[in-house]
Amino acid sequence: MSLLEITDAEFEQETQGQTKPVLVYFWASWCGPCRLMAPAIQAIAKDYGDKLKVLKLEVDPNPAAVAQCKVEGVPALRLFKNNELVMTHEGAIAKPKLLELLKEELDFI
């Protein structure tokens, strides 16, 4: 499954009531670290898309989701499992560290 870009209007529908865990990647077009992290997010969406829904949300045009998830900086990650926020991370991280974080909550990583 590919990375799905969403907006404030789609946030609730795409993150709540899902059968799979949902990873939301918050980013900004002006953010250098976001550009560095993007390939890792795309790879995770490709490698685990059958078991993990991966969403991408640009922060500037979508302030409601940013406020709801208490995003204080970008890049940022939020992992939802069974409609609950179970993991948060702010700042760029390499793919191996990201997989480590996800492994704490997801048994298929």
Swiss-Prot record:
InterPro entries: Thioredoxin, Thioredoxin-like_sf, Thioredoxin_CS, Thioredoxin_domain
Keyword tRNA processing: no
The name this protein goes by in its record: Thioredoxin-like protein slr1139
Organism, scientific name: Synechocystis sp. (strain ATCC 27184 / PCC 6803 / Kazusa)
MF (Gene Ontology): protein-disulfide reductase activity
Pfam families: Thioredoxin
Family, similarity comment: Belongs to the thioredoxin family.
Highest taxon of the lineage: Bacteria
GO cellular component: cytoplasm; cytosol
Cysteines joined through disulfide linkages: C31-C34
UniProt-listed GO biological process terms: cell redox homeostasis
All residue ranges annotated as the Thioredoxin domain in the record: 2-107
Record key words, sorted: Disulfide bond, Electron transport, Redox-active center, Transport
